[in-house]
Design a protein with these regions (language model features):
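Conserved non-catalytic scaffold segment of RNase H-like nuclease domains
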Residues: 2-95
Length: 97
């Protein structure tokens, strides 16, 4: 999960760049592109001193391995009622990153 306070400390430096900066974080059930699925997507968008934040748990449609639970803190119970990725994908296209 995002550590928002850490990124907010950098917002002043990002502002000096005079362009938008987006930090994206994806969590998944593992590292295999063909077998594993996204469990969370989050981003921070810094522009003109403003910070936009988006964070969404995603139901991967498969169990999260215990080692991934230990690594990310995201449990099967947390994603059980979350939307599937294809349900949120259209919303992501509306985000101007």
């Amino acid at each position: 999960m995002f550590h928002l306070s850490r990124w907010l400390r950098l917002s002043e430096a990002f502002t000096r760049l005079n362009r938008p900066v987006v930090v994206v974080d994806l969590e998944s059930t593992g590292g295999n592109l063909y077998q594993d699925r996204v469990t969370e997507i989050a981003f921070l968008r810094f522009e003109n001193g403003r910070v936009e934040h988006y964070e969404q748990l995603i139901n991967p449609g498969k169990p999260i391995p215990e080692f991934v639970v230990q690594l990310t803190g995201i449990t099967n119970e947390m994603v059980a009622q979350a939307p599937a990725f294809d349900q949120i994908a259209p919303d992501l296209s509306l985000i101007h990153i």
